């Protein structure tokens, strides 16, 4: 039996079987393991496999990809597909898809019989509202008597408008008692709703996510917030009879409410005409079809009429059921459904008390007194109500917002802040000239990551409209885009120090991103397990960075001791390149040497505790490189005390195979340094004349001799003595002095000196390591100083310190700009301690350099040796 005959045979047998032919053009060949799928025939979408993506079903033609519609064959329970069309599709599919046909089993219908009529009606509402260029006609108007609609312009829904549209549709499905079918509705209407690029699963997630009583939208000025809201209100009022809405629009200014009412009324008049025309035309078409079959059509159609508001400002749209085409609405007709709209300014408390609404648009929410919510919230508890809050950002003319929508995030609330920007688009927004484009279009919700890192919503406006003078009006400034980094609170991947050069107002720019923070806390490394599974999973080198705070001493009872806070971080690296924190310390030396007050000994104890514990726990790491930052602390003494403790560790534990290294700076000896300075200074006044050395004035090139009044040479006694001394000191020739300096002794000093590249290292760490998920902590994070005293987890404590690190811009009196890294400002002229964050960042930044270190004329690595006699320091 041929393929066509087989399909026709089976297709004529049952009502619960359909055939779907694989669309190789889009998805490729289906695997052998995928032979059947369950799908909902009402929308024509399968459940388990994206390969089977298109179905023509019982009564809804849901082509999701019309280009390949002939590749799909389906026979519904009422046999609605014409025979000729079936044969044509079968032939096309057999030739195009190499006879690959798969049988799909499905239920006959997924919608309750009592709700099929409502579903048809609601889908018709979506079709009418989304077609006919209504968004363009109702929003893109020119406010002048002689200008028509701007029909030549193309309308694009902004991301917030797309979300607002879906939000209203989901709310109306609930009002029409179809909330349980919202996934079905959105999937069926995906093309006209702009959801073509999304899978059925994702569309279902959108439907569930928007099932909230409250939604909040924070939108830049002049982006179509109010006009689009008015458009959606008018569409629902005129084309959704089953909703039975009582809609309220409220704002803080009377002219806004007046304009909204006028706009909605004008839109409703145009929409009702279209609604009545389409419904009557469909009714007549069905009547004629039934007449051709010599049957009587017993259906009906809706016809709408509106009543303008009077004193109470209510606009009423009434819907009447008619079974006769062309009939006019009479005053005696009883409406089958009514939609009402009111636009009321909120001037004082209790303005909205007593009324009942089930769809509320609260415009410019940031400017309204918060008492309004006490009046509106109770309405959300009944009758499947919905409240949509929209607002622009506060500007600099207002001290603070009345309502911070950002803080209303809760289970029953959906928020959409349009300024949400993903990291990949962050830099492109900053670099462009026009700061008005603040929306990232990579996501339908425009919110892959959050903007507004801890600041109030009112600061967002200032981020893009910086005032150079506080007394001036808010205007766009050339520096507006530069402040975006500090307001969005995220670190774009690949950002370098050069990207922020030239930017002003970089205040408290947070460096950590939400993606990096999530990875840091949720993807902790089980180092022991990883080493058991793969012994070479980690490098054998651990780098410890010591950030000793410049010593601050305090005197109590005639005893002086160090009160500074010091920090250490121990970092290892996986062979995959990811960095793992094995241990952290944050301590004061007084805590460990309360009697002797020996700060160096206390610091050495903490260092050796980290080394010993990490070596014993993992039995893998055998090279520890200590990087102590050079400042006023006596690091040589710390190194000496580490040698004493190493002797004890070697004698009592198995530490023979452990190497502890530290960088040291190589400098000239004291004699060599002084000699070089003397050589450079005196070279200016020494010259060789015929093999002898004489003193001459370097300016006049004359002998420095003084004369008496009678012309005789008179060398003063003190000058004579000084010249004699100078001649004695310069008895060495130039070549002899140069040779002596070249072969003078070297001086070695323990420590690492940061060469002014701190900002660059921090930007590189957060941009290319932390925010790219290459930095995490060990599950067994060790800390001798913090382990027993911390109220929160050590990893969270370290993350808190990293969160507090910010980039700051300082401009001196001369206008010279400089960038610095510090802890976030807590109080006036005070900053959060950043020592632990600095140690973690620097340990990671320097890891590869010192692990693969090669000696240079300025720096070397020296190995710690056990010290057996306290009298000698090696």
Curated annotation (Swiss-Prot):
GO terms for biological process: chromosome organization. Gene3D superfamilies: 3.30.420.320, P-loop containing nucleotide triphosphate hydrolases. InterPro entries: DNA_pack_C, DNA_pack_C_sf, DNA_pack_N, P-loop_NTPase. This is Uncharacterized protein ORF109. Signal peptide: none annotated. It comes from Ostreid herpesvirus 1 (isolate France).
């Amino acid at each position: 039996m041929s393929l066509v005959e087989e399909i026709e045979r089976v297709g004529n047998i049952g009502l619960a079987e359909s055939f779907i032919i694989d669309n190789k053009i889009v998805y490729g060949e289906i695997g052998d393991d995928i032979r059947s799928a369950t799908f909902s025939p009402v929308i024509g979408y399968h459940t388990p496999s994206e390969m089977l993506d298109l179905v023509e079903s019982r009564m809804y033609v849901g082509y999701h990809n019309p280009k390949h519609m002939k590749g799909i064959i389906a026979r519904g329970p009422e046999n609605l597909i014409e025979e000729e069309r079936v044969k044509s599709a079968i032939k096309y599919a057999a030739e195009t898809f190499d006879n690959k046909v798969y049988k799909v089993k499905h239920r006959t219908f997924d919608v309750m019989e009592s709700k099929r009529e409502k579903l048809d009606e609601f889908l018709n509402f979506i079709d009418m509202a989304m077609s006919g260029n209504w968004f363009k006609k109702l929003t893109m108007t020119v406010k002048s008597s002689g200008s028509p609609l701007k029909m030549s312009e193309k309308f694009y829904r902004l991301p917030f408008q797309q979300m607002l549209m879906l939000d209203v549709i989901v709310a109306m499905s609930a009002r029409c008692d179809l909330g349980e079918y919202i996934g079905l509705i959105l999937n069926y209407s995906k093309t006209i709703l702009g959801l073509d690029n999304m899978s059925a699963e994702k569309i279902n997630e959108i439907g569930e996510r928007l099932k909230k009583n409250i939604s909040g939208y924070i939108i830049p000025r002049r982006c179509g917030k109010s006009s689009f809201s008015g458009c959606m209100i008018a569409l629902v009022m005129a084309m959704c009879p089953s909703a039975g809405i009582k809609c309220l629009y409220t704002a803080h200014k009377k002219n806004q409410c007046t304009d909204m009412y006028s706009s909605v009324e004008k839109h409703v008049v145009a929409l009702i005409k279209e609604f009545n025309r389409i419904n009557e035309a469909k009714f007549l078409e069905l009547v004629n079809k039934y007449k051709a079959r010599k049957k009587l059509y017993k259906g009906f159609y809706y016809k709408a009429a509106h009543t303008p508001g009077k004193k109470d400002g209510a606009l009423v749209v009434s819907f009447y059921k008619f079974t006769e085409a062309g009939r006019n609405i009479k005053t005696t007709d009883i409406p089958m459904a009514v939609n009402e709209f009111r636009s009321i300014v909120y001037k004082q408390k209790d303005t909205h008390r007593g009324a009942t609404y089930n769809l509320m648009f609260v415009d410019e929410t940031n400017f309204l007194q918060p008492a309004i919510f006490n009046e509106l919230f109770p309405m959300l508890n009944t009758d499947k109500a919905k409240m949509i809050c929209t607002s622009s950002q506060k500007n600099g003319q207002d001290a603070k917002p009345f309502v911070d929508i950002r803080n209303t995030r809760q289970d029953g609330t959906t928020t959409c802040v349009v300024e949400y920007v993903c990291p990949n688009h962050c830099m492109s927004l900053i670099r462009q000239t026009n700061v008005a484009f603040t929306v990232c279009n990579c996501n339908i919700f425009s919110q892959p990551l959050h903007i507004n890192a801890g600041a109030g919503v009112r600061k967002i406006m200032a981020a893009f409209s910086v005032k150079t003078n506080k007394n001036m009006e808010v205007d766009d400034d050339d520096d507006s885009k530069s402040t975006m980094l500090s307001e969005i609170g995220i670190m774009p991947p690949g950002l370098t120090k050069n990207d922020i050069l030239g930017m002003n107002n970089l205040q408290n720019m947070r460096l950590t991103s939400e993606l990096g923070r999530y990875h840091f806390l949720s993807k902790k490394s089980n180092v022991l397990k990883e080493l058991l599974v793969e012994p070479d999973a980690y490098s054998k080198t651990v780098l410890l960075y010591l950030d000793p705070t410049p010593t601050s001493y305090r005197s109590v009872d005639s005893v002086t001791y160090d009160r500074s806070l010091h920090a250490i971080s121990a970092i290892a690296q996986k062979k995959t390149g990811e960095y793992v924190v094995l241990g952290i310390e944050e301590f004061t030396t007084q805590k460990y040497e309360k009697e002797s007050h020996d700060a160096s000994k206390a610091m050495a104890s903490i260092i050796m505790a980290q080394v010993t514990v990490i070596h014993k726990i993992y039995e893998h790491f055998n090279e520890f490189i200590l990087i102590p930052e050079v400042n006023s602390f006596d690091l040589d003494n710390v190194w000496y005390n580490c040698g004493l403790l190493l002797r004890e560790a070697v004698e009592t534990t198995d530490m023979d195979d452990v190497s502890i290294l530290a960088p040291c700076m190589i400098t000239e000896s004291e004699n060599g340094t002084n000699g070089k300075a003397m050589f450079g200074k005196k070279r200016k006044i020494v010259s060789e004349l015929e093999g002898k050395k004489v003193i001459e004035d370097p300016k006049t090139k004359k002998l420095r001799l003084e004369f008496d009044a009678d012309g005789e040479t008179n060398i003063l006694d003190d000058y004579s003595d000084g010249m004699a001394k100078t001649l004695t000191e310069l008895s060495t020739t130039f070549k002899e002095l140069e040779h002596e300096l070249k072969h003078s002794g070297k001086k070695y000093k323990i420590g690492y000196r940061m060469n002014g590249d701190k900002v660059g290292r921090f930007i590189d760490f957060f941009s290319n390591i932390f925010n790219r998920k290459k930095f995490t902590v060990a599950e067994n994070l060790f800390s001798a100083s913090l382990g027993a005293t911390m109220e929160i987890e050590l990893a969270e404590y370290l993350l808190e310190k990293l969160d507090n690190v910010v980039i700051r811009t300082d401009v001196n009196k001369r206008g010279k700009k400089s960038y610095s890294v510090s802890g976030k400002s807590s109080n006036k002229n005070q900053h959060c301690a950043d020592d632990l964050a600095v140690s973690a960042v620097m340990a990671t930044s320097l890891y590869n350099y010192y692990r693969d270190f090669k000696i240079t004329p300025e720096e070397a690595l020296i190995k710690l040796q056990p010290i057996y006699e306290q009298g000698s320091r090696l």
